[in-house]
Amino acid sequence: IAKRGKAFNMKIIYHSRRRHLQEESMVGATYYPKLEDMLAEADFVVLVPPHTAETDHLMSREQFKAMKPTGIMINAARGPVVDNEALYDALKTGKILRAAIDVTDPEPLPLDSPLFTLENLVIMPHIGSAVVETRRKMFSMAVEQLMMGLRGERIPNCINPQVYK
């Protein structure tokens, strides 16, 4: 993400639990130890952490309040990383300009979710696996497991393991 942003002459800033010096030097990124300090400076906030107890509702009311009113948030992580109510409020009241999400909590969103009423929110289906490397791995796993099945071996990711009884 940082490399692509750099190609558009974006200033790259980031927050993480740990500093990544090698990646910083590759794209000229600036590390912010405090999330809210980074949010106050960022024009675009792209979320990509795993969902853990620590990152649950990482973006909630306080974090949206810290963002610029012209800020754009993109959640490409997991749905629960963003508090839906706080996101709705931030977009509805103009605390942030726009948002785009390809993950929701719950997945899928109920059809009556107020998020669907917002014109400044783009909701897309999750496409996290749609990268060449991941698709190659998926293809390799499928072929490997097909061959295992043809050889009569137990398939490790079998969705109906009762066939082995």
For each predicted feature, which ranges?
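Rossmann-like adenosine-cofactor binding region
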Residues: 18-114
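Conserved anion/nucleotide-ligand pocket segment
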Residues: 1-11
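C-terminal helix-to-coil terminal segments
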Residues: 107-165
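Short, structured coil segments at secondary-structure junctions
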Residues: 8, 27-28, 117-119
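The conserved SAM/SAH-binding core of class I Rossmann-like methyltransferase domains
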Residues: 15
